[in-house]
Structures are given as C-alpha cells and as structure tokens.
Amino acid sequence: MATQLFPTRRSLLAGGAAALVGAGLPRLASAAGRPVNMQLGWITGGNQIGEIAAKRLGYFADEKIDFAIQPGGPNIDGVAIVASGRYEVGQVSSSPSLMLAASQGLPVVCFAVGAQQHPYAFFSLPRAPIKTPQDMIGRKIGVQATGQVLLTALLRKNGIPEDKVQKVIIGSDMTPLVSGQVDAITGWRTNTTALKILGPDYLAMPLWDNGVKLYALPYYTTADFLKSSPDVLAGFLRATGRGWAYVKDNPEKAVDLLVQEYPNLVRADELAAVSVMLGVEFTERTASHGWGSFDPAVWQDQIDMFDALKQFSAGKPKADQVFTTAILEMTEKDRPKLG
C-alpha cells in the first residue's frame, strides 16, 4: 500500500539516471493485445483493487490490452522508470510527485486521477483530540520527513505560525501516538491495517477538508506515449473505470478477487479499507464528470502552493507539463458517472 507522499528531489534525479540504464529492456508482449504495464512505487495492495477487478473480469482483454502491474518498493523510483520509456503508464501515491518530476524536466504527465480527495490525515486519540488545525497549537505533531511540507502548508492555510506547533519526525507506524510521544500523527485513512493499533475511537482530521487539496493515486504516462498511443490510454482508462465501478457495486466480491490475486493480503483488512477507498474514489465530481476525472483548477492551486513553499528548485512547472485532459475527453462518455 502506498504510504510515502512523494520522493525527494534528490531521489527523482538519482532514480532518473538509474532507470535509463534499464530503458532498453524489452517490453512484455502477448497475443492477448497491446501490453500496458503499470509501474507502482509501492508493493501492490488494496489501492489497486479496481485494476485487479478489471484484469480478472476481462475488462482489459475487452480493450485488447495485455495488462500487468509492476510493483515498486523502497529502492524503486517508478516515475523515473516510466519516464525512461521502459513501461507505458504509472501511478504515484500523491500528486506532488508529478509536479516535482515536471519541475525537474522528467517527461511525464498525468492523464487521470484515482482518489479525488487525498486520504492523508492527522490522527489523534480521545485523550487529546485534534479536530481542527487550531487544536494543533501547543501540541506535538508526528510527521514523516516527506510530509513536513504538508504540515507547513496546513498551518499557513489556517493562519497558524509554525513555531506554535512542535514538529516531531517519525517513521511509518503509529506507535508514537499510542505511547504518547506525540499528540497527532500522519497517515492514510485507507491504511486500516496500520490504524488498528489506535483502537476504534481514534479521530482523523483530513488534509483535504482543511484547505490543502491534493490528489492521490494519479495515473501518468510519458509525453511520447501520450502522443503515439492515445487510443491505448483511452482503452486503459475505460477498462480501469469499469473495474472501479464493479468494486463500488460489489465490494465484497471485489475484495475476493483482490485476495485471489494477492493471497498475502488479509480479507478482513481489505474489506475495511475498501469502504474508505470508495469514499475518496467516487465523489460529487465523479458523479458529474466521471471516474478518473480531475479539476485543472485544483492542479493549478497545488502548483501555486508548492511554488509558494519553495519546493521547485528547478523552477515552477507549467500546468501543461503536469497534466493533460486529452484522454479524459476521449473517454468522456465511457467512464462511469458514479458518486
């Protein structure tokens, strides 16, 4: 499951060089159709339940696509791999990854978005509840190193001086909150396995609801593949949208398909996670604009916000370097309009 928000600028540059070494490796081919490999930055899990449903139910085959997920991990820079041309599409955990990549000159562009509202949140316990950003004043907030900029953004958005909050750098588990080392801790609301340790009464303060609007699980490709194979991307989006619609209508059956594909996953945990995931995958926007859509204005706000936070060492990227609506427009009538 994706947990890291986005790579550092150093890892983007280092990963780009490493990926070029393998750029000449042959792509997978099959009589089933045109290969589409989706590179992740993490180990495959519940975030890909829609793609797994589409694969196992034959939706990709209907589009003459031979689909495969390429898992990531701690030492795999998925953005750099896709940018090198080795694989056709990719998915990152959070939209800032693609803004930073565009700023560094990597030729990748977002063509659709999975989670319309990022499930990143600040978690607290009833003994010291944090329900609003103002409740953070005078408190210890545990945040991963890559998430420091988001805490800064949240505080600025809500008019809170940074020196009024004590920032504590933590790892990826929730233990510091349970032990009382911190009063709040960051994570994904969809990561129900990690949240178990907090018990049933924990509180979640979503980043999105408090002014910092990021996208999660955006899909991206290279500028070259976008130009040469828009029909393949459109087919990929149609099939994936059908898969997610199936998950929404049949969550338990979809979890069964997921666990059949990845037997290491725990069915009960994935059932708990899928209900949270569907809440951010399908919103009022998808009801009117279709699954996978995004608002260009939200993207521009993100670019402006990260520029104000001085995150673009190589310069602020232009909107058309970060995203394209071309494939969404091609599939406007085909993507499920569900909310």
Language-model segments: residues:
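Secondary-structure end/capping motifs
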Residues: 228-311
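A residue-level marker of the well-folded mature domains of exported/periplasmic proteins
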Residues: 69, 166-167, 179-180, 184, ...
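Short, glycine-/small- and polar/acidic-enriched structural segments
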Residues: 31-179, 183-189, 200, 205-206, ...
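N-terminal export signals
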Residues: 4-5, 11-31
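Conserved C-terminal helix/tail region of periplasmic/extracytoplasmic solute-binding proteins
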Residues: 299-339
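Structural motif detector for alpha-helix initiation sites
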Residues: 9, 132-133, 319
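Periplasmic-binding protein-like
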Residues: 114-124, 196-229, 237, 276-281
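Short linear loop/turn motifs
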Residues: 68, 76, 271-279, 317-329
